[in-house]
């Protein structure tokens, strides 16, 4: 009887090992590859947009003409998705750090996620504010689990529109593709954002979106705004509330890669191309389905 009783309790020799294997089996069976982030909180969340057009003269950085078109386009698209959008223009480094610290310390308990966009010049692992550069990891670090508890397990999306190198992407035309580019007005000149930005790890549930692959120029039109933000906003408008977000970003990569420089003061840039990239540390599928009121 004692032996049978032991079997029922799971204590005979080898029993604990067998139960562990069984538990592991059921855990594997319960793993859902299509699991989605919980996006039915009261609020969608905050979307910060730091827009930098002009810089302190001592930095010798050129104006980023067209960036206000990016800011307005992003504001419209993220508002449509239900975000509370907050825009800041040409902040000094100290001001920018203060604003982002304030947002990192408020409660996001009733929010789905968080978005932060930087429209600026970049260099290495830094992004430029009006008067100085700021380390990107300093900014993302404010939203890690040990600093921002209310965003633990929630998507944290950082979008960086900045140049990331000193090379243009040389176009290679696929044999089965004819590149039919639409004509553009001469007044809409293509420029590049200065310097370079590295791909940086951030942590679980972060998504780092870059306007261009590391080591290459990011192109911006002086009237319409940057290629990346134009195409990101177009895809958000068409598929933002239906398509899984990393799938949408892949479409953005394709759209931007089909562009080329037509008008530029630098003749060597004519015909050059650009491919964005993103580094996903997301652990579930991310959808921005419309909220039910």
Swiss-Prot record:
<dbReference type="InterPro" id="IPR011600">
    <property type="entry name" value="Pept_C14_caspase"/>
</dbReference>
<dbReference type="GO" id="GO:0097284">
    <property type="term" value="P:hepatocyte apoptotic process"/>
</dbReference>
<dbReference type="InterPro" id="IPR002138">
    <property type="entry name" value="Pept_C14_p10"/>
</dbReference>
<feature type="region of interest" description="130's region">
    <location>
        <begin position="125"/>
        <end position="142"/>
    </location>
</feature>
<keyword id="KW-0963">Cytoplasm</keyword>
<dbReference type="GO" id="GO:0004197">
    <property type="term" value="F:cysteine-type endopeptidase activity"/>
</dbReference>
<feature type="active site">
    <location>
        <position position="163"/>
    </location>
</feature>
<feature type="active site">
    <location>
        <position position="121"/>
    </location>
</feature>
<keyword id="KW-0564">Palmitate</keyword>
<keyword id="KW-0449">Lipoprotein</keyword>
<feature type="propeptide">
    <location>
        <begin position="1"/>
        <end position="23"/>
    </location>
</feature>
<dbReference type="GO" id="GO:0030855">
    <property type="term" value="P:epithelial cell differentiation"/>
</dbReference>
<dbReference type="GO" id="GO:0060545">
    <property type="term" value="P:positive regulation of necroptotic process"/>
</dbReference>
<comment type="subunit">
    <text>Heterotetramer that consists of two anti-parallel arranged heterodimers, each one formed by a 18 kDa (p18) and a 11 kDa (p11) subunits. Interacts with BIRC6/bruce. Interacts with RIPK3.</text>
</comment>
<feature type="region of interest" description="Disordered">
    <location>
        <begin position="1"/>
        <end position="20"/>
    </location>
</feature>
<dbReference type="GO" id="GO:0008234">
    <property type="term" value="F:cysteine-type peptidase activity"/>
</dbReference>
<dbReference type="GO" id="GO:0005829">
    <property type="term" value="C:cytosol"/>
</dbReference>
<comment type="function">
    <text>Cysteine protease that plays essential roles in programmed cell death, axonal degeneration, development and innate immunity. Acts as a non-canonical executioner caspase during apoptosis: localizes in the nucleus and cleaves the nuclear structural protein NUMA1 and lamin A/LMNA thereby inducing nuclear shrinkage and fragmentation. Lamin-A/LMNA cleavage is required for chromatin condensation and nuclear disassembly during apoptotic execution.</text>
</comment>
<keyword id="KW-0068">Autocatalytic cleavage</keyword>
<dbReference type="InterPro" id="IPR015917">
    <property type="entry name" value="Pept_C14A"/>
</dbReference>
<dbReference type="InterPro" id="IPR016129">
    <property type="entry name" value="Caspase_his_AS"/>
</dbReference>
<keyword id="KW-0865">Zymogen</keyword>
<comment type="similarity">
    <text>Belongs to the peptidase C14A family.</text>
</comment>
<dbReference type="Pfam" id="PF00656">
    <property type="entry name" value="Peptidase_C14"/>
</dbReference>
<dbReference type="GO" id="GO:0005654">
    <property type="term" value="C:nucleoplasm"/>
</dbReference>
<dbReference type="InterPro" id="IPR001309">
    <property type="entry name" value="Pept_C14_p20"/>
</dbReference>
<dbReference type="GO" id="GO:0006915">
    <property type="term" value="P:apoptotic process"/>
</dbReference>
<dbReference type="GO" id="GO:0043067">
    <property type="term" value="P:regulation of programmed cell death"/>
</dbReference>
<keyword id="KW-0378">Hydrolase</keyword>
<keyword id="KW-0539">Nucleus</keyword>
<dbReference type="GO" id="GO:0005634">
    <property type="term" value="C:nucleus"/>
</dbReference>
<feature type="region of interest" description="Tri-arginine exosite">
    <location>
        <begin position="42"/>
        <end position="44"/>
    </location>
</feature>
<dbReference type="GO" id="GO:0016540">
    <property type="term" value="P:protein autoprocessing"/>
</dbReference>
<dbReference type="GO" id="GO:0002218">
    <property type="term" value="P:activation of innate immune response"/>
</dbReference>
<dbReference type="GO" id="GO:0070269">
    <property type="term" value="P:pyroptotic inflammatory response"/>
</dbReference>
<dbReference type="InterPro" id="IPR033139">
    <property type="entry name" value="Caspase_cys_AS"/>
</dbReference>
<protein>
    <recommendedName>
        <fullName>Caspase-6</fullName>
        <ecNumber>3.4.22.59</ecNumber>
    </recommendedName>
</protein>
<feature type="modified residue" description="Phosphoserine">
    <location>
        <position position="79"/>
    </location>
</feature>
<feature type="modified residue" description="Phosphoserine; by NUAK1 and AMPK">
    <location>
        <position position="257"/>
    </location>
</feature>
<dbReference type="InterPro" id="IPR029030">
    <property type="entry name" value="Caspase-like_dom_sf"/>
</dbReference>
<dbReference type="GO" id="GO:0072734">
    <property type="term" value="P:cellular response to staurosporine"/>
</dbReference>
<dbReference type="GO" id="GO:0042802">
    <property type="term" value="F:identical protein binding"/>
</dbReference>
């Amino acid at each position: 009887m004692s032996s049978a009783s032991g079997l029922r309790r799971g204590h005979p020799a080898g029993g604990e090992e067998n139960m562990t294997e069984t538990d592991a089996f059921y855990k594997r069976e319960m793993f859902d590859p299509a699991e989605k982030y919980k996006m039915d909180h009261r609020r969608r969340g905050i979307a910060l947009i730091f827009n930098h057009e002009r810089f302190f003269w001592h930095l010798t950085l050129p104006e980023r003409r067209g960036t206000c078109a990016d800011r307005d386009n992003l504001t419209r698209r993220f508002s449509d998705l239900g975000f509370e959008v907050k825009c800041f223009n040409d902040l000094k480094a100290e001001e920018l750090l203060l604003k982002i610290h304030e947002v990192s310390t408020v409660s996001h308990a009733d929010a789905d996620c968080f978005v932060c966009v930087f429209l600026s010049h970049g260099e290495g692992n830094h992004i430029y504010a009006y008067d100085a550069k700021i380390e990107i990891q300093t900014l993302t670090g404010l939203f890690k689990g040990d600093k921002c508890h209310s965003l633990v397990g929630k998507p944290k999306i950082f979008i960086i529109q900045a140049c990331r190198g000193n090379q243009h992407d040389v176009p290679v035309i696929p044999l089965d593709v004819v590149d039919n580019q639409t004509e553009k007005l001469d007044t809409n000149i293509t420029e590049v954002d200065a310097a370079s930005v590295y791909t940086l790890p951030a942590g679980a549930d972060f998504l780092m979106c870059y306007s261009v692959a590391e080591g290459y120029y990011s192109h911006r039109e002086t009237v319409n705004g940057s290629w990346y933000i134009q195409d990101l906003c177009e895809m958000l408008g068409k598929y933002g509330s239906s398509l899984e977000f990393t799938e949408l970003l892949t479409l953005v990569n394709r759209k931007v890669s089909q562009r080329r420089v037509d008008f530029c003061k630098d003749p060597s840039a004519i015909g050059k191309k650009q491919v964005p990239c993103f580094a996903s540390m997301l652990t579930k599928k991310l959808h921005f389905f419309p909220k039910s009121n």
